[in-house]
Amino acid sequence: MMQPLYLVGPRGCGKTTIGMALAQATGFRFADTDRWLQSHVQMSVADIVEKEGWGGFRARETAALEAVSAPSTVVATGGGIILTEYNRRYMHRVGVVIYLCAPVSTLVNRLEAEPEADLRPTLTGKPLSEEVREVLEQRDALYRETAHYIIDATKAPAQVVSEIIAALPPSTQRLQGDVYT
């Protein structure tokens, strides 16, 4: 059994897409803190924030993080999970943290292309490109401080997964044939 792999980064960096592909490539389970939370409270993130505020959402997010953390699991986290110091320390201590790093332009393009974009509550109330820039400026140092590895997430998902696997200690990789899975 291996430590969980936590994917952190801003909205649109590919945590869920890369996470599912990485789980398949490593034979790990996959979990998404936002999806777990939404399925357990039967509300969208926007509804939770509207009813409980960001503080209530962040408390629930910590509970979700702890609930999905298990050996041999790839965990896609919410973009703001690193705002809570406990979460940063927990992920860094319990698992391997991978920051999926991408520039504002890439993040905005991906977010604009997402069909569920309207389900995500605005963080600042500003236009998307301005919001993404501000949020990334506020959080980038926290992502970097928390991460064991920083990976360029602008590439194709398969290439990002290959780079993550190459960066991980050999004991995390399972080689089957000529493909890391």
From Swiss-Prot:
- In its UniProt entry, the species of origin is given as Salmonella typhimurium (strain LT2 / SGSC1412 / ATCC 700720)
EC primary class: transferase
Q: Which cofactor does it need?
A: Mg(2+)
Q: Where is this region: LID domain?
A: 112-126
The record's gene field reads aroL
Cited InterPro entries: P-loop_NTPase, Shikimate/glucono_kinase, Shikimate_kinase/TSH1, Shikimate_kinase_2, Shikimate_kinase_CS
**Subunit-structure text:** Monomer.
Taxonomic path: Bacteria, Pseudomonadati, Pseudomonadota, Gammaproteobacteria, Enterobacterales
| Name listed for the protein in its UniProt record | Shikimate kinase 2
Cross-referenced PANTHER family, in alphabetical order?
A: SHIKIMATE KINASE, SHIKIMATE KINASE 2
Q: Which CDD domains match?
A: SK (cd00464)
What is the documented function of this protein? Catalyzes the specific phosphorylation of the 3-hydroxyl group of shikimic acid using ATP as a cosubstrate.
